Design a protein with these regions (language model features):
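Extracytoplasmic/lumenal ectodomains and periplasmic regions of secretory and membrane proteins
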Residues: 166-234
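Sec/Tat signal peptide C-region and signal peptidase I cleavage site
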Residues: 17-21
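Short, solvent-exposed coil/turn segments at beta-strand boundaries
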Residues: 54, 61-62, 94, 180-187
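Conserved polar/disulfide-associated segments of primarily extracytoplasmic proteins
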Residues: 22-56, 70-175, 195, 217, ...
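Bacterial N-terminal signal peptides
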Residues: 7-15
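Short conserved aromatic/hydrophobic patches within beta-strands of well-structured domains
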Residues: 61-67, 211-213
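C-terminal single-pass membrane-anchor helix
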Residues: 231-287
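Bacterial N-terminal signal peptides that target proteins for export
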Residues: 1-6
Length: 287
């Protein structure tokens, strides 16, 4: 009996040591994550930044901005895909984050009718196909549930907008997408937020985007005969632009590349990042 007790005690000691070692490793990983977040070059508003050489964005007070290099690091820290061209803007409380990227695929004609139900099915199929790459990387799969906001095109602002509801192991999030049409292509804006915060976040993003503009000579109205024209219209912008064209041509390597990059942004694995950034700017204000 006594021998059994000592064996049990010894086993408990081993387990306790393993738990302490695991906790120490977790603390070290957390500190490494915080250190990498701290090292990013956070640009605080109010200021105006040049975006990808053809446009400008005014960052309001109480907002922050990351350039392309720092945005790539920020995304990859959270197991989100990046092609290294996106920039990020967000309020300091990190209730939402928006990513901007210009695609020089040509002038997109805006006279196409949008079939929202058909587009939703295509997006759901694309998301499922993209999960193959996420599984290969050891990342959690995504499920596109429904529209949060069906696609709407504003002929005055030349902005196409929609929002989708996505589920993952970490929970539910909303991706709100905007395409701002220009002379030589379009700027994609993807906002990530909690579904409960969507209405307020949309309003805030709309305010921020009033400070975004193409440079002189680069607006949609500046298009001239002879300029490059995209091979697709508004509907294809929603389901992937160049990938939609590739599907018609059988260019499956292009389609595969799109599926790897599609649904880059979901609020997954960002709790620590959001908490740290909030605390960072709170400390700076207090100081």
């Amino acid at each position: 009996m006594l021998r059994s007790i000592w064996v049990a005690v010894a086993l408990l000691a081993v387990v306790s040591a393993q738990v302490r070692a695991a906790d120490a490793d977790a603390d070290a990983d957390k500190q490494a994550f915080v250190d990498q977040m701290r090292a990013l070059n956070w640009v605080k508003g109010p200021t105006t930044v040049e975006v990808q050489g053809n446009s400008k964005l005014t960052i309001p007070d109480q907002y922050v901005y990351l350039d392309a290099g720092n945005t790539k690091k920020f995304l990859e820290l959270q197991h989100n895909l990046s092609d290294g061209r996106e920039v990020m803007v967000a309020p300091q409380n990190m209730e939402w984050m928006a990513y901007l990227e210009f695609s020089d695929e040509g002038y997109v004609k805006d006279n196409e009718k949008i079939d929202a139900p058909a587009l939703l099915k295509t997006l759901q199929s694309n998301t499922e196909a993209g999960n193959e790459e996420r599984r290969r990387r050891g990342w959690n799969e995504l499920k596109l549930v429904d529209w949060a906001t069906p696609p709407v095109y504003n002929t005055t602002t030349k902005r196409l907008e929609w929002a989708t509801i996505l589920d993952s192991k970490e929970g539910r999030a909303v991706n709100f997408s905007t395409k701002i049409l220009g002379r030589r292509g379009y700027t994609s804006v993807i906002m990530v937020t909690d579904p409960a915060n969507l209405q307020a976040a949309e309003s805030n993003l709309d305010h921020v985007l009033t400070g975004y503009s193409f440079n002189a000579g680069e607006t949609y109205a500046d298009w001239r005969s002879g300029d490059k024209v995209a091979e697709y219209g508004l509907a294809a912008l929603i389901v992937g632009g160049v990938a939609a064209v590739a599907a018609k041509k059988g260019l499956f390597s292009v389609i595969g590349a799109f599926l790897v990059a599609s649904w880059k942004f979901l609020m997954i694995g960002v709790v620590a990042a959001v908490t740290w950034v909030r605390n960072l700017f709170a400390r700076k204000r207090a100081g």
